[in-house]
Curated annotation (Swiss-Prot):
InterPro entries: Viral_coat, Vp20_capsid, Vp24_capsid, Vp25_capsid. Coiled coil: none annotated. Capsid proteins VP20, VP24, and VP25 form a capsid enclosing the viral positive strand RNA genome. Together they form an icosahedral capsid pseudo T=3 with a diameter of approximately 30 nm (Potential). It holds the Pfam family Vp24_capsid. GO terms for cellular component: host cell plasmodesma; viral capsid. GO terms for biological process: transport of virus in host, cell to cell. The record marks Q374, G375, G592, Q593, E767, G768 as: Cleavage. This is RNA2 polyprotein. The lineage of its organism: Viruses, Riboviria, Orthornavirae, Pisuviricota, Pisoniviricetes. Specific enzymatic cleavages in vivo by the P1 encoded 3C-like protease yield mature proteins. Residues 350-370 are annotated as: Disordered. Residues 350-366 have a biased composition (Polar residues). Keywords: Capsid protein, Host cell junction, Transport, Viral movement protein, Virion. It comes from Cherry rasp leaf virus (isolate Potato/United States) (CRLV).
Amino acid sequence: MEPERSQLAPEEVPDSFRVETPAAMLARLRAESAAKKEAARRAAMPYNDDLLVGSELTYLAKDDVFGCGRSALKRLFSRPSAEENVVVSHPLSVKEQVVRYQRPRTDHDPYVAVYTPLPHITEEQARKLMEKGFSNSSNVALDMAVQSHVGQGTPLLAMCGIMDSRTDDPNEALQVAGYFDLGRDRCDLISLPLINFPLNKEDFDDYMRGLYLCTMFHNVRGFQNNKALCSYSAVGFDQHKETPRCIRSRVKESWEDILARNNENEFSRVQSGQNLLNAIEKERNEAIPDVGAHQFACVPPSKGTPQTSLLTSDGVIKRPNFTLPRSASTRFNMPLNMRYSGRNSVDTARHSLTTNSGGRSTSLRQDPNLLEGQGPSIDFTKIIFPTVVERNFSNPRAEIVNTIKQLYGDTVETLSVNPPESYSAERLIGRVFSTLHGSFGATDLVEGKVLMSVKIVDLLSSANLGALLLAEVLGGNLTMRVTALITLNKYTSFALKLVYDELAQLAPDATNFGVASVLPGAIFPSQEKSFSFDFNIFSMGSYINFKENEGFGRISLVALSSPNLPDQMPDSANITLEFSVVNVDTSVYNLGQGQCLDLDRFPVHVTSKSKALSGGAKHAQAEFSLNLYELGPHFNRFQAICGHLAGYSGDLIIDWMISASALTNGRCYIVPVYDQNTFSEVSEEKLRQCKYVSKELSLNRSGTVHMPFSSSFGSYTKNKYPKLLFVFPGGISGPSGETIHVNIQVRDVLHFSGLGHQLLKPILAAEGPDPFSFHLFYLHCGTLKTESLNKGGMWCVPVSPINLAAMKHGTGSSLVFNESFVSKTHNWLHYMASCTAYWRGTLTYELRVTYNSRVNAVANLVAFYTSQVEDLFGFSDKAVGDTGIASICGDAFSVRISIPFVTPTLWLRTYRNAYDVFTSCNGSLYFHLPTSGVKSVQLFVRAESDFSFERFRALKAEYT
């Protein structure tokens, strides 16, 4: 039962019994009066709610919303200006409105579409709109000023469209679009009228923030990635009504009226050519050519500004920094349009060095990310043609399982043949499965000395591990992590490098800086308590002669410098290497990641020798020449390609490290030097004038710098290359007698572009712009000596990209080549085969014969092929009937035959420590030679469109 109450609750008192306070009564009367006035005003209005709310003389000026901007006349007669000189009146920064060229993912894309935010008003300006009575409009015209950043006369046509992010249907999302020519003499103002923007109070903010610009460029050629093409400046929205009272109405009845606005001023424009010399002038209103149907995707629906690869929810262009994780990786995974920067980035034309954390230096550990130490696979065409071999071997395990299920139904079960005590990779991910210990002494700290080496196959073959995990590796790619632990006192410091030696080119007890400097790896100081990086184990597939999985290679720890304080170095120090599994990928094969001469990122991994600096108050400076053409005792894949290029361009990514004691300090400036400039001593005042920022050596011992491409000569060559300086203007303070060491490693070249070719310049004009065109034949083997001619019989040639004549493999005495010609093996095919570990694809051979006279050319030449490998490169007396499974007949002067990749394995080796025809050759060729009247015999070879190399090996400089 509810208890009795003596009085009512406040909410139970009727309103008629309440006593209204003076303030509440005044507010109520004012509200009632305002409502009556609003009703009377609406009743007296001569037009409906769809029109402007307010008196007939109320009009909005652009200054009320967007501030004072340039007049249309000034914009019309202004010239295209540089990116940094663009000044706009819109509150958004011009940097956020710049449209930059974004290289498409593939070369097949006919258009380049760039999405940028549509400039919109701020909350303060929206409030002013509401106060003015701007409630709704059925017709809104939009004017945008466009600043072109390309050269006058550049034939670059662009389409600008406004899209709605609330839908993913392109036909529904596209609001309005129009064309403009960025190479026009006066490309500054475009007008996109007849846009229906429902600017009511409910969805005003959501709709405006959901709009974005889609700029689509046609026939973009020759621009570097991230190049600024144009900028959108001030934007004006005008409300228009089709009434006599609207004195500012520009509403048009048809598109013909809209196009007629472009004919108000008659003048011609330049359409082709980078300058006015020999330019072709055409009419301004020339008909736009048919560019075909547009195909573009909508930005996914989102709240606010659409999320794209270039935008954030705040409408700011995203400049993604490459965050450096603690562990580095050798796996290649190149995001599109990625901008890389390490802890510091040399990012302006004045070479100013800025930091990434708001100008503050940090002492947090940032290890390098060793992405794909082997480099991308080499593919020699822009169009990838699938072959039967690819379909059969793209994923052997999945294909077999699918076949069994199709034959016997889904209930069939595949039994495991692995022992029960084995562990799969999934159970090992993230766990340390092997720990190895070693030690070294002070006398071992010699440049290039291997302090500890571990064979990968020994790890995978250990007890309770090998069977199942090894089976997964043979069917895919395994990513492992190695962590180095070194215990030393804080006063001792020296440089080290963890090296992934896939082909075991470094002996466990070797001292060879030449090989260690070009093998993929990561550098770190000894004062790091732990350092790790990831490496990717590559499997060439199952093969009958694949012995003991020796291709997995070794992990080696190499010394790069001597200790800074030899007296403080203990007699013996301990090393611990821990191994764990990061990931297992069953994707075993693809056709590569791009062209040799046009790569977003090309791994280099060239380590320079240490520069030693003594402590003291005097000026100290370490200089590194970044001449990647310069060959040491060994060189790698990147240098092999550079050897055939007249020059290259690209941004350099450089890891740097300074090894010193914990008590050492000093101000360090990292200074890039271009165009062969030399500085014997750089003053600190000059560095500060150039806006360089110093680093405290006690807080910054290592990092990564991004060195943009800059050259007055247009490219880096053997004689024109940049330098990197480490300047200590105030000297180095530290323990007496200390010697610090500065180390750098050129990790990658971004936006790599090869220029010219040293050997094939006369041929390139007829073969296209690609110097590595697979249409070119390369003289691969040479001319026979006179005493070897007219013997008849068969010439045996194992199918391999290696120049077997230069190696003198199995040639014997019956088939001898001219030594002067055989030594000229400087062609890219032999270089790439020598600097890589595996190959696959089609090779085409052509035998050419010249005779003493035409009467001797009486018999057609014949080529035979067999899948059986013959360990012979030279004369063979084998009978014709025993030679091959396929043959082809040419004419009396030449015969050509193409050999597809028919070996029952995913890849073949180039060669390891020694050339092995049984693991390196795709069968054998036999050429039936003439018996008399022969003057010379030459053999040519070329790689076809499906040819590619994989993985990494170091090559001796003398073996070319």
